[in-house]
């Protein structure tokens, strides 16, 4: 018995350390199989169990786009949306702050970053890039180990009917190095539930200690495993459910400290659970995937899916089935959540997923063009009831998938042509150039997967320059690092321990309502009130709480009240100063304010001593605040104008503003045209010109849920929430019958705004670019900056008009035409870089680039005419013979080459070399050798002999060549040319 338990333990250890996977090695029937249950029923049973039996609140799945978490590419676990609770930073006024016990089914994507299953999808029967995580949570010690284990056991054995003898348990065995004891409490809980000791096994921190990241909340976990073998032979164990008990915090120095509050965080993959309950050895055999696999077979007329892996999967047909089925689910979910295929970050990962799916469907399953988009309705059918956003956006998802598939196929065809053209220039032993492969790849212009490029070359029997490709990849990484936005210096911050201590002491959250205490004077200027406050806490730069700070010390201040706006919601923090009561002549500069779990932390420099309990008076930088207010109100107007112009499907994806400019990211079906950009600006100008009142009011969050047209972001809002309405009182705007939110700007927003729109002055969109397919970033300025942008635009328009007139008059000679072309080139650069209306930039660039083409055409015509004239002069000067060596005036090397070419056309048996003196002693050289004089006499060698004498260089071929040099003795150069040619003839 002991030996069998030890063997089972070793098997479990190996299974865990290889990462849990359904290996599908055993196809014997499962004993005591539970009755088949649809995936939708399994999901519903989980949620209903925790809601109805154990009083959990059901919360919707968060978007797979991480909310304010730059450490993640995608939401990859159920706990992601609850990080503010674990870190203690949740807004105490928000709905989330009231969460005690919750449950949900969370959409998760693991493709890129630390958790990346992309390349494993298709190779086995378990990996997915998209999956659903069923989870239940208890926050702040609502319940802990005993209740969590009891609930999990009850659900699995009583609700789902999984036989107890098929469940195995692992728990934390301790970590002496970290000073952590074995989690015997959890072990004893499982034993008390009747799990035999032989199936309760202990493991170290690698398997049973869960951490959020390098730092942050963490704790021991216990895992429930399912035995696929059902007691027949050795156990085949797969992880089913992970229960994490967060009770520690990993500090920056690597040490562990107890958390102020303990939490329970559990996660169970729906796909794996459904496979168990439906008696399947693979998640792909469940009803979550079978409709997709059937649709793939019908659409591709491929052989049926048989679930084969490895060498048994001849032709990789079943691998392709799994790749396509998984990837179309991921694409559909991501696009419905506003992540579109693009060129960097999550959009780039999504682009790779789409192109991987197209490759497998096209190359292996022989799918027809447009096939991938046809699978979207099947995804919506299987997941749409649980995630309604799939139903709402199904048409957009299908269109985007089909468009990107078509673009990829076009790129593939272009790539084949480029490869064939490049191969024709290579020698038998040459490697394929890394530069060309790079331009074909996902990092270059065409976006082809690099392994596909390598496969195409392999089929041609050509080896890729891998070393060169690695060098280019390193250069690209360095370039991206240089181009990346500089990381903002981390300001003072309150960690989970500091926040926990404040809560333990009963320190109330900062009252920041005074930030809204400002008014509009009859003169049109704003009056910002001061704020009286008391110092409640002081922190040094390293976050240590102190009783006082001294002269010159950078510190953080917590006050009972503040009129400073803390950075959030895309709006920059206020700045200003504070003075101590009775000492108004000593200013304490405040550089920024940040929100930390409901507390506003002011970052200041103390010119003198400051102590706990001191009374202070706060003053915001009025010009800075007013600039932020104008940009924020302008952002709302711009957001509304975009919807009015482009349609109601235009959604804000994010924004950032400061007094200098505003940035707004929005969903767009296609890039904006100049006409649309101008129309958006005009709509904003109209609202500004009407000088409408801006109404702001706090209302219960529930009142905003069903208001048509009201705009909000995927953020956690406080309750009550502030509503900002332009031109319509908030009460009227929130009346669903009024439809007011469809006619004007009405948004949930905690920022500071103008009281009337007229103070925006003007708005000019100065830039736009596609962040990804379907997402556009707009840059805009307001007020005086906008007027300056318009004036500069008009000035450049006049310059373009003048250039047009100059071009229409024509040029007398090549030199004049070249000067005009250079002037037009400088004008193009000026238009491209100017801060001016973007719609006007687009129009002027189209015009000025057309002028450039016309100017170049005029130059070529003048050069041809000049070359013809000089050709005749030279032919008249030289009698018919085998050689012409002479000097001629030419404005450029291209003109000189044309003269040489025309001479040789009119005298085919003559070899020609011409020199053209230029300013500063520079000399141009061009030559061509008659066909009859080769191969002993070559143009490249001829030009090199002459140019090297002049200290220059030459290049070309056996027939034609050119070069440059510098000399004051042209006769000597001509003599060398003559002598060399005669020696070769």
From Swiss-Prot:
Effect of residue 242 to A: In mutant 5A; abolished binding to lactate and protein lactylation
Consequence when changing residue 210 to A: In ATP-binding mutant; abolished ability to mediate protein lactylation
PROSITE patterns: AA_TRNA_LIGASE_II_ALA
Chain positions recorded as ATP binding sites: 110, 128, 210, 240-242, 269
Effect of residue 199 to C: Found in patient with leukoencephalopathy; uncertain significance
Chain residues that bind Zn(2+): 632, 636, 749, 753
Binding site for L-alanine: 242, 265
Record field: catalytic activity: tRNA(Ala) + L-alanine + ATP = L-alanyl-tRNA(Ala) + AMP + diphosphate; (S)-lactate + ATP + H(+) = (S)-lactoyl-AMP + diphosphate; (S)-lactoyl-AMP + L-lysyl-[protein] = N(6)-[(S)-lactoyl]-L-lysyl-[protein] + AMP + 2 H(+)
Cofactor binding, per record: Binds 1 zinc ion per subunit.
Cofactor: Zn(2+)
Cellular compartments annotated: Mitochondrion
Protein family: Belongs to the class-II aminoacyl-tRNA synthetase family.
Disorder association: Combined oxidative phosphorylation deficiency 8: A mitochondrial disease characterized by a lethal infantile hypertrophic cardiomyopathy, generalized muscle dysfunction and some neurologic involvement. The liver is not affected. Leukoencephalopathy, progressive, with ovarian failure: An autosomal recessive neurodegenerative disorder characterized by childhood- to adulthood-onset of signs of neurologic deterioration consisting of ataxia, spasticity, and cognitive decline with features of frontal lobe dysfunction. Brain MRI shows leukoencephalopathy with striking involvement of deep white matter, and cerebellar atrophy. All female patients develop premature ovarian failure.
Subunit structure: Monomer.
PANTHER family given in the database record: ALANINE--TRNA LIGASE, MITOCHONDRIAL, ALANYL-TRNA SYNTHETASE
Biological role stated in the UniProt entry: Catalyzes the attachment of alanine to tRNA(Ala) in a two-step reaction: alanine is first activated by ATP to form Ala-AMP and then transferred to the acceptor end of tRNA(Ala). Also edits incorrectly charged tRNA(Ala) via its editing domain. In presence of high levels of lactate, also acts as a protein lactyltransferase that mediates lactylation of lysine residues in target proteins, such as CGAS. Acts as an inhibitor of cGAS/STING signaling by catalyzing lactylation of CGAS, preventing the formation of liquid-like droplets in which CGAS is activated.
Protein name as catalogued: Alanine--tRNA ligase, mitochondrial
């Amino acid at each position: 018995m002991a030996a069998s338990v030890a063997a089972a333990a070793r098997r479990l250890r190996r299974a865990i350390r290889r990462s849990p996977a359904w290996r599908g090695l055993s196809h014997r029937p499962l004993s005591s199989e539970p009755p088949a249950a649809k995936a939708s029923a399994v999901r519903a049973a989980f949620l209903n169990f925790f809601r109805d039996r154990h009083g959990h609140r059901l919360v919707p799945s968060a978007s797979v786009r991480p909310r304010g978490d730059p450490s993640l590419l995608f939401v990859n676990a159920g706990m992601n949306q609850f990080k503010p609770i674990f870190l203690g930073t949740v807004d105490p006024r928000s709905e989330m702050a009231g969460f005690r016990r919750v449950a949900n089914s969370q959409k998760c994507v693991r493709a890129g970053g630390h958790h990346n299953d992309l390349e494993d999808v298709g190779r086995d029967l378990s990996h997915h890039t998209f999956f659903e995580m069923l989870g239940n949570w208890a926050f702040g010690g609502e319940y802990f180990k005993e209740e969590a284990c009891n609930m999990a056991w009850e659900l699995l054995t009583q609700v789902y009917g999984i036989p107890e003898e098929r469940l195995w348990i692992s728990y934390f065995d301790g970590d002496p190095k970290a000073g952590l004891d074995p989690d015997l409490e959890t072990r004893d809980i499982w034993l008390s539930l009747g799990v035999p000791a032989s199936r309760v096994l202990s493991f170290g921190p690698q398997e049973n200690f869960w951490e959020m990241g390098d730092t942050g909340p963490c704790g021991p976990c216990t895992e429930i495993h399912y035995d696929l073998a059902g007691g027949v032979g050795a156990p085949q164990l797969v992880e089913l459910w992970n229960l994490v008990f967060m009770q520690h915090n990993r500090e920056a120095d690597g040490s562990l400290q107890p958390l102020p509050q303990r939490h329970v965080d559990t996660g169970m993959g729906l796909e794996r659970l459904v496979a168990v309950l439906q008696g399947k050895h693979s998640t792909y055999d469940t009803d979550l995937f079978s409709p997709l696999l059937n649709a793939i077979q019908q659409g591709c007329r491929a052989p049926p899916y048989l679930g084969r892996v490895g060498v048994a999967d001849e032709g990789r047909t079943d691998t392709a089935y799994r790749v396509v089925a998984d990837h179309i689910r991921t694409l559909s979910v991501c696009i419905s959540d506003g992540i579109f295929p693009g060129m960097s970050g999550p959009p780039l990962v999504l682009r790779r997923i789409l192109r991987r799916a197209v490759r497998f469907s096209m190359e292996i399953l022989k799918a027809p063009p447009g096939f991938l988009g046809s699978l979207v309705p099947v995804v919506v059918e299987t997941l749409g009831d649980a995630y309604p956003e799939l139903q709402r956006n199904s048409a957009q998802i299908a269109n985007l998938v089909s468009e990107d598939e078509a673009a990829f196929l076009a790129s593939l065809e272009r790539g084949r042509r480029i490869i064939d053209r490049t191969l024709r220039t290579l020698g038998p032993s040459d490697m394929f150039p890394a530069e060309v492969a790079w331009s074909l790849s996902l990092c270059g212009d065409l976006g082809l997967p690099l392994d596909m490029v390598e496969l195409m070359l392999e089929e041609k029997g050509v080896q890729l320059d891998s070393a060169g490709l690695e060098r280019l990849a390193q250069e690209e990484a360095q370039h991206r690092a240089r181009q990346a936005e500089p990381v903002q210096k981390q300001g003072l911050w309150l960690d989970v321990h500091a926040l926990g201590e404040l809560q333990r002491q009963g320190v109330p959250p900062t009252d920041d309502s005074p930030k809204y205490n400002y008014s509009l004077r009859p003169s049109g200027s704003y009056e910002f009130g001061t704020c009286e406050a008391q110092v409640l806490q002081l922190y040094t730069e390293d976050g240590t709480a102190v009783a006082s700070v001294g002269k010159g010390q950078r510190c953080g201040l917590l006050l009972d009240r503040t009129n400073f706006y803390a950075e959030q919601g895309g709006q920059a923090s206020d700045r200003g100063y504070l003075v101590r009561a009775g000492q108004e002549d000593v200013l304490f500069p405040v550089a920024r304010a940040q929100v930390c779990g409901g507390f506003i932390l002011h970052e200041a420099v103390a010119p003198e001593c400051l102590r706990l309990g001191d009374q202070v008076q706060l003053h915001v930088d009025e010009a800075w605040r007013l600039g932020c207010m104008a940009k924020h109100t302008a952002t709302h107007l711009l957001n509304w104008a975009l919807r009015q112009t482009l349609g109601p499907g235009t959604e804000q994806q994010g924004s950032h503003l400061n007094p200098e400019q505003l940035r707004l990211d929005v969903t767009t079906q296609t890039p904006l045209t100049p006409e649309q950009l101008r129309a958006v600006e005009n709509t904003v100008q109209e609202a500004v010109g009407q000088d409408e009142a801006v109404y702001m009011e706090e209302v219960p969050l529930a009142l905003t849920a069903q208001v048509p047209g009201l705009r909000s972001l995927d953020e956690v809002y406080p309750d009550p929430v502030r509503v900002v309405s332009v031109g319509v009182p908030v009460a009227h705007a929130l009346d669903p019958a009024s439809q007011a939110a469809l006619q004007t700007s009405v948004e949930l927003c905690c920022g500071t705004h103008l009281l009337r729109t007229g103070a925006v002055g003007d708005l000019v969109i100065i830039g736009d670019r596609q962040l990804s397919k379907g997402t556009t970033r707009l840059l805009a300025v307001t007020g005086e900056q906008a007027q300056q942008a318009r004036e500069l635009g008009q000035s450049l328009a006049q310059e373009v008009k003048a250039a047009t007139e100059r071009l229409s008059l024509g040029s007398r000679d090549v030199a004049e035409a070249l000067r005009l072309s250079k002037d037009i080139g400088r004008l193009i650069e000026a238009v491209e870089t100017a801060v001016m209306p973007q719609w006007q930039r687009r129009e002027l660039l189209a015009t000025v680039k057309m002028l450039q083409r016309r100017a170049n055409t005029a130059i070529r015509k003048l050069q041809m005419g000049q070359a013809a004239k000089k050709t005749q002069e030279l032919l008249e000067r030289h009698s018919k013979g085998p050689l012409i060596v002479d000097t001629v005036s030419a404005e450029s090397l291209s003109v000189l080459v044309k003269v040489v070419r025309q001479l040789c056309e009119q005298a085919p048996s003559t070899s020609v070399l011409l020199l053209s003196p230029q300013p500063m002693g520079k000399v141009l050289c061009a030559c061509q050798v008659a066909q009859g004089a080769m191969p002993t006499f070559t143009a490249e060698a001829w030009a090199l002999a002459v140019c090297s004498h002049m200290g220059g260089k030459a290049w070309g071929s056996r027939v034609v060549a050119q070069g440059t040099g510098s000399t004051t003795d042209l006769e000597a150069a001509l003599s060398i040319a003559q002598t060399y040619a005669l020696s070769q003839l």
